[in-house]
Amino acid sequence: MGCLGNSSKTAEDQGVDEKERREANKKIEKQLQKERLAYKATHRLLLLGAGESGKSTIVKQMRILHVNGFNPEEKKQKILDIRKNVKDAIVTIVSAMSTIIPPVPLANPENQFRSDYIKSIAPITDFEYSQEFFDHVKKLWDDEGVKACFERSNEYQLIDCAQYFLERIDSVSLVDYTPTDQDLLRCRVLTSGIFETRFQVDKVNFHMFDVGGQRDERRKWIQCFNDVTAIIYVAACSSYNMVIREDNNTNRLRESLDLFESIWNNRWLRTISIILFLNKQDMLAEKVLAGKSKIEDYFPEYANYTVPEDATPDAGEDPKVTRAKFFIRDLFLRISTATGDGKHYCYPHFTCAVDTENIRRVFNDCRDIIQRMHLKQYELL
């Protein structure tokens, strides 16, 4: 009995335990409430779009503009990726010279051994970037035949940053090379999986989710649809004369339009508005002004397209460029206005993802829209 009596707690002890439990519960509830409020206050943005549209570049811009950019160690880690871009670019161009129809010969036959060297190192994954490699790349890039093949890059699969890095081969080859922010923005690395970037603008928290755009990556998107404030859909406008990597047949811009339509009409996303980034405006302008690839050859309806009266061109913009960019904008708006249910809206913006000032201005313009979507999301509007 004595032992039992000693092990049992007095009413006073039990009261103390109960009080401690209540205090602990109160602290937990307070923390949970704090987390709920923080979650509700966060704007979650989902970046969607077809492969190579510029989604990851937008994320990099958010880091440059709103996080602290890239530290020296991160820049150092990107050197190998940038040099790999150089290798991929020159291998692709040199290999395409004999496969495109009609084929393109080297302008200087003395460069043949350089071309053979580049083709021989193509399959090597763990490649050492020697001075010999960079010298061959530089000489080949100066060859007018290689340049002529590059000009026909819509006929094969070439990364967008090819010209940018090939023109900067002298700096990229330096032993003490340090990539600039622009180099990091241009660097192409395939996005696989889901990447989250967190940043704050004027004390407002943003979580941006970047998902791979290639067809086999899209099944992962559904994981990100829960509680999204807005979708930022990125479309590469300059891709009107290109085909996708996945099948080497489907027009890239058509693929982007079809994907946009499937997202717009997705029953799980009927109340989520889309901010449309009509990207790669710089490359679109270059193609249109070069006049080699006519939009009407790929989109016959362009022949009868008239620019809307309310269209506002950029200062000094060529009318041909204005017509092209608004035509592509209207292809997307035709999809978003077809339903007309008033449950979600499409807000188009012309962007150049590698231009930091352009993205700063566009994102600032979007913040009011995102705020309204956020208030609507939690029925505060």
Curated annotation (Swiss-Prot):
GO cellular component: heterotrimeric G-protein complex; plasma membrane
Binding site for Mg(2+): S56, T191, D210
Residue span of region G4 motif: 275-282
EC annotation from Swiss-Prot or TrEMBL: 3.6.5.-
Compositional bias annotation for Basic and acidic residues: 10-25
Main localisation: membrane
UniProt subcellular location: Cell membrane
Region: G3 motif, residue numbers: 206-215
Lipidation (S-palmitoyl cysteine): C3
Record's subunit section: G proteins are composed of 3 units; alpha, beta and gamma. The alpha chain contains the guanine nucleotide binding site. Interacts with GAS2L2. Interacts (GDP-bound form) with RIC8B (via C-terminus); promoting GNAL folding and association with the plasma membrane.
Protein task: Guanine nucleotide-binding protein (G protein) involved as transducer in olfactory signal transduction controlled by G protein-coupled receptors (GPCRs). Contains the guanine nucleotide binding site and alternates between an active, GTP-bound state and an inactive, GDP-bound state. Signaling by an activated GPCR promotes GDP release and GTP binding. The alpha subunit has a low GTPase activity that converts bound GTP to GDP, thereby terminating the signal. Both GDP release and GTP hydrolysis are modulated by numerous regulatory proteins.
Protein name: Guanine nucleotide-binding protein G(olf) subunit alpha
